[in-house]
Amino acid sequence: MFSSVAHLARANPFNTPHLQLVHDGLGDFRSRPPGPTGQPRRPRNLAAAAVEEYSCEFGSAKYYALCGFGGVLSCGLTHTAVVPLDLVKCRMQVDPQKYKGIFNGFSVTLKEDGVRGLAKGWAPTFLGYSMQGLCKFGFYEVFKVLYSNMLGEENTYLWRTSLYLAASASAEFFADIALAPMEAAKVRIQTQPGYANTLRDAAPKMYKEEGLKAFYKGVAPLWMRQIPYTMMKFACFERTVEALYKFVVPKPRSECSKPEQLVVTFVAGYIAGVFCAIVSHPADSVVSVLNKEKGSSASLVLKRLGFKGVWKGLFARIIMIGTLTALQWFIYDSVKVYFRLPRPPPPEMPESLKKKLGLTQ
């Protein structure tokens, strides 16, 4: 599979100009016409520089594997770091009478459980979101290449927002299957006092009570929450980066240093995160209540909460998701920089399309 994807990636519109030089300029140089001295012509220095600049080809198995590793770090570490805020948010959703607001929620939790109580659920959070990040970012890169090659260069540019939405939705579908068991255990630990304090205690107890259903009954609401969230996260980020370089950053991306590019990544990530929190919050409320209660269904929970109830805890979630999304993109892009992975610039209109639209002579 990866070999076919790598082959498609070579001509992909999201590929970098440097990598195109690698593919076009570093073929079998013995087949090149001989030079004036009769020796085979050597590849251009520019292509050689591109080989030294990147650690792997765009679209190779190594590229996708390292993108997945970047997803593990970006999602696993950030979600674990905000466990206290997530815990209070979940408790506000399932028991709004007791936890009346974000500050009151922290106060009540500290009073009843102490400082250690704020870390409840850290293990399933780390494991679950690490697996989710692996699938989310790794498969996004795969689907982006596959879908863009199905569309062709010109349509990829014209319909790039739709492509981002489709690729991210496809990736998140699989990512949520990996996340669901750990998310169910996390919510039980955080919202049911006395049920279990650790993943080791919660998982066997859940299986004994409800079987495998206990771990996957929340997967459909997870799709409801995470797929819109991820579609917004990737599409909004990609287009915000494009807009920042076009209208805000005073110089082209190619002239920006790596730290400057990472600042743009962080800002675009935070903007995307605010929108992510808003579109996914109602489903997040349903997931929190559903995983707390035995024998309940998403439709019953949604009916009971009502329109006002599903928006409880939104402010806390905007703070959490905005910061979270910005840090995730920053970490993910930093991993690409560290491992010297290809980082294509924002897409530009193909020359063939410019000619069709009469934008060039």
From Swiss-Prot:
The N6-methyllysine modification is found at 111
Q: Where is the transit peptide?
A: 1-49
- Organism of this sequence: Pongo abelii (Sumatran orangutan)
Where is it found, in Gene Ontology cellular component terms? mitochondrial inner membrane
Described function: Inorganic ion transporter that transports phosphate or copper ions across the mitochondrial inner membrane into the matrix compartment. Mediates proton-coupled symport of phosphate ions necessary for mitochondrial oxidative phosphorylation of ADP to ATP. Transports copper ions probably in the form of anionic copper(I) complexes to maintain mitochondrial matrix copper pool and to supply copper for cytochrome C oxidase complex assembly. May also play a role in regulation of the mitochondrial permeability transition pore (mPTP).
Question: Could you tell me which residues the Solcar repeats occupy?
Answer: 62-146, 159-243, 260-338
Phosphotyrosine-modified residues are 195
Give the gene name.
Answer: SLC25A3
The cross-references to PANTHER family, in alphabetical order and at most eight, read: SOLUTE CARRIER FAMILY 25 (MITOCHONDRIAL CARRIER PHOSPHATE CARRIER), MEMBER 3, LIKE-RELATED-RELATED, SOLUTE CARRIER FAMILY 25 MEMBER 3
What InterPro entries is this protein classified in? Answer: Mitochondrial_sb/sol_carrier, Mt_carrier_dom_sf, SLC25A3/Pic2/Mir1-like
Q: How does it assemble?
A: Interacts with PPIF; the interaction is impaired by CsA.
Q: Which residues lie on this side of the membrane: Mitochondrial intermembrane?
A: 50-62, 141-160, 238-260, 333-361
* Places the protein is found: Mitochondrion inner membrane
Q: What is this protein called?
A: Solute carrier family 25 member 3
Transmembrane feature ranges: 63-85, 121-140, 161-182, 218-237, 261-283, 314-332
The entry sums up its family as follows: Belongs to the mitochondrial carrier (TC 2.A.29) family.
